[in-house]
């Protein structure tokens, strides 16, 4: 039947259905009765019509092209959405076509005929997919896909280079996808890499050892190729135990393809055996030394490829995940030319800068290969300190008569031979030199920068060793090596640059920590001799100098006297140091909080001469000229802390010096205000000012006037009392009169009033 005929037949069928529905609705309409009869509404339907030709049926096929015309077509050649042909009563089919029609009707109309197995042949490449090239078993496909996905995880790690990952040789039964993947992985196995791996935990180290052990265990008796890697490593471990264990390794890996029979084994050299044994002993005895796991041999084995691939992938994945969790790995691709260029640039550095924080030894990580080091140029002047540090490191390593002595001999032989070392651009000079000397007591470390003899000796290269050895042996009971002396020398040189800034802080700390008895004795011994000769002329000429400068001088006196009391320094050397410190601290130190701490000095002596700079003389003349115009300064009160420190400590030493001055002040009882002197102490000033009250002259005239005034006041008070009593009487009289006036309006009195 043609398309127009089909279209016309469907249109007529639709019209017939609509007409039949209209007729049924007319027959089965609701019967509305009149509301006047109060009958309920009848919503009942009539029975549906039976034996209708155009009745609606639900047993029609729900396919995409069932009731649509021929114009509705889907242009999808790859997908089969065709539905089975309908069986119509109008068309007559031959007996040959009936079996085919029945078979089509038996098919499930909801069946999706797309072949999902064709996805195995789907490829993103330019070549069209080849149908029929399926894998032998689905289990092989799943295993290979899992293996490739796991092995690709290692490529996602950002090592900065392509890590060599060995894959199994693909068999003939593998698909083209496996062949391409293995070819891509094989192309990455022939690269020379230089990596620097930093591991911060022991767990990652052990995991790496186990993973490489499993990796080395993969062997095949029929292997045709063997990939051996030569690794040259150097273990780096900082000496500080407080920080987290850090393992730094610089390894150069060279991949080589050597045809060799699979059953051949490589005999390890004696050097390698001794070093490996030494490493094992160090691993057991000293936990601070960490070794880099050696990368074992990697082999291609065609027999039993699945187990080998699984082991390789799991071990590599576990090691890389742990490395990624602990610390980011830094790696670079370096050639031999770049390494030589870096040696020339880094050649001026000393070996002590790298071995300053290292424990361990250089060892060969692969069996049967000679150990090579990259020699750097080192100045001959630094070899003595380097050898001393190497010996110090060798003493710290655990000693075993069978294994560790051989490893130490190898280490010394390698380091004495041109002092070779591995250099890389990742090893850089530390910004600040590290000191290995333990901190001494707080008082000793604070006093050392103040003494100028120690600072001068630290700056003088001739007597460095003698002076610093004395300091170190005083601070610590045990002897120190040359390395500790060098570290202390660097530490003191850095401190010598900031002496002016550190002086004030150290002096304040020392003055607060000094013993009260020692300070009192030293002040009483030296105030009369050296301090008075310097302080009296200044106070005489300046009158009232700035309290900040005097405070600085007094604090310098306290510090230098306590330091000068030591047995090591003679008393004669204290006086020039005291004068120089006063002249320097007056220019450098800021003025301190004003207080009357300096009042415990001796009284003025007018006969002494003035020894001060010209600037101070000029200030003194200006102050003397303007003294008559300026008001007198107020007495400054001290803080509670200074009252405790100064008054209690210097009370005994200064008590005798103020006896004469107290008697002199007590005799002067005049109306004039008592002048304050900077020599008197605030404590005694308060007592004297309380006792020295100015007497008031008793005047008879004033007393008589006061008595007369008191009498007058008493008289006025008496008069006021009398007036008050009189006022009360008047009030009573007024009340009585008012009552009488009110009684006049009473009716008893009206008759009497009317007669009048």
Curated annotation (Swiss-Prot):
Keywords: Coiled coil. It comes from the Eukaryota. Residues 125-139 have a biased composition (Low complexity). InterPro entries: At4g18490-like. Residues 701-741 form a coiled coil. Residues 1-20, 81-109, 121-157, 170-269, 562-644, 656-681 are annotated as: Disordered. Residues 8-20, 90-99, 583-608, 619-629, 663-675 have a biased composition (Basic and acidic residues). Residues 189-208, 230-251, 562-582 have a biased composition (Polar residues). This is Uncharacterized protein At4g18490. The lineage of its organism: Eukaryota, Viridiplantae, Streptophyta, Embryophyta, Tracheophyta.
């Amino acid at each position: 039947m043609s398309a127009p005929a089909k279209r016309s037949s469907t249109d007529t069928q639709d019209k017939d259905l609509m007409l039949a529905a209209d007729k049924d609705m007319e027959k089965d309409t609701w019967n509305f009765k009149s509301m006047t009869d109060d009958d309920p509404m009848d919503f009942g339907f009539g029975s549906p019509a039976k034996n209708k030709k155009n009745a609606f049926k639900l047993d029609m096929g729900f396919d995409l092209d069932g009731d649509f015309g021929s114009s509705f077509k889907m242009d999808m050649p790859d997908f089969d959405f065709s539905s089975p042909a309908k069986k119509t009563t109008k068309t007559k089919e031959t007996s040959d076509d009936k079996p085919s029609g029945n078979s089509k009707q038996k098919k499930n109309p909801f069946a999706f005929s797309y072949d999902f197995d064709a996805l195995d042949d789907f490829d993103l490449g330019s070549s069209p997919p080849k149908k029929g090239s399926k894998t032998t078993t689905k289990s092989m496909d799943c295993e290979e896909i899992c293996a490739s996905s796991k092995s690709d995880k290692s490529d996602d790690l950002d090592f900065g280079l392509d890590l060599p990952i060995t894959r199994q040789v693909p068999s003939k039964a593998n698909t083209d996808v496996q062949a391409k993947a293995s070819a891509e992985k094989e192309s990455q196995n022939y690269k020379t890499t230089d990596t620097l791996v930093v591991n911060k935990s022991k767990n990652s180290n052990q995991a790496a050892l186990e993973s490489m052990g499993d990796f080395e265990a993969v062997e095949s008796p029929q292997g045709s190729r063997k990939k051996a890697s030569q690794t040259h490593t150097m273990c780096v471990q900082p000496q500080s135990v407080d920080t987290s264990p850090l393992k730094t390794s610089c390894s150069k890996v060279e991949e080589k393809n050597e045809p060799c029979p699979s059953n051949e084994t490589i005999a390890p050299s004696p050097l390698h055996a001794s070093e490996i044994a030494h490493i094992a002993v160090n691993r057991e005895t000293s936990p601070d030394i960490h070794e880099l796991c050696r990368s074992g041999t990697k082999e291609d084995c065609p027999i039993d490829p699945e187990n080998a691939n699984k082991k390789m992938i799991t071990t590599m994945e576990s090691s890389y995940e742990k490395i990624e969790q602990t610390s980011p790995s830094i790696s670079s691709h370096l050639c031999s030319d770049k390494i030589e260029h870096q040696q020339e640039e880094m050649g001026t550095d000393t070996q002590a800068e790298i071995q300053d924080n290292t424990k361990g030894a250089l060892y060969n990580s692969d069996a049967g290969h000679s150990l090579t080091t990259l020699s750097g140029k080192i100045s001959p002047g630094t070899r003595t300190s380097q050898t001393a540090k190497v010996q110090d490191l060798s003493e710290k390593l655990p000693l075993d008569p069978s294994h560790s002595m051989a490893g130490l001999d190898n280490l010394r032989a390698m380091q004495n031979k041109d002092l070779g070392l591995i250099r890389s651009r990742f090893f850089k000079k530390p910004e600040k030199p590290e000191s290995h000397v333990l901190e001494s007591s707080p008082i000793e470390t604070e006093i050392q920068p103040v003494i100028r003899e120690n600072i001068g000796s630290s700056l003088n290269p001739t007597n460095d060793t003698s002076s610093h050895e004395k300091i170190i042996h005083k601070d610590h009971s045990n002897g120190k090596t040359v390395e500790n002396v060098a570290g202390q020398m660097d530490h003191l040189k850095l401190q010598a640059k900031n002496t002016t800034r550190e002086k004030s802080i150290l002096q304040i700390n020392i003055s607060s920590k000094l013993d009260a008895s020692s300070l009192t004795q030293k002040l009483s011994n030296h105030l009369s001799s050296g301090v008075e000769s310097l302080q009296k002329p200044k106070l005489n000429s300046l009158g009232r100098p700035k309290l900040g400068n005097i405070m600085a001088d007094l604090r310098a006196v306290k510090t230098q006297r306590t330091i000068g009391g030591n047995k090591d320094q003679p008393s004669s050397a204290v006086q020039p140091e005291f004068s120089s410190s006063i002249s320097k601290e007056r220019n450098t130190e800021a003025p301190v909080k004003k207080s009357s701490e300096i009042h415990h000095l001796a009284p003025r002596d007018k006969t002494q001469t003035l020894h001060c700079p010209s600037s101070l003389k000029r200030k003194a003349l200006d102050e003397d000229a303007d003294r008559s115009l300026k008001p007198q300064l107020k007495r400054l009160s001290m803080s509670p802390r200074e009252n405790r420190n100064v008054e209690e400590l210097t009370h005994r030493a200064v008590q005798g010096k103020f006896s004469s001055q107290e008697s002199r002040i007590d005799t002067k009882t005049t109306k004039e205000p008592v002048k304050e002197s900077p020599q008197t102490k605030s404590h005694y000033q308060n007592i004297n000012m309380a006792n020295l009250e100015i007497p008031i002259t008793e005047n008879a005239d004033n007393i008589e006037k006061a008595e007369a005034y008191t009498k007058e006041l008493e008289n006025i008070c008496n008069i006021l009392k009398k007036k008050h009593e009189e006022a009360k009487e008047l009030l009573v009289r007024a009340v009585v009169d008012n009552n009488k006036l009110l009684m006049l309006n009473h009716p008893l009195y009206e008759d009497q009033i009317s007669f009048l």
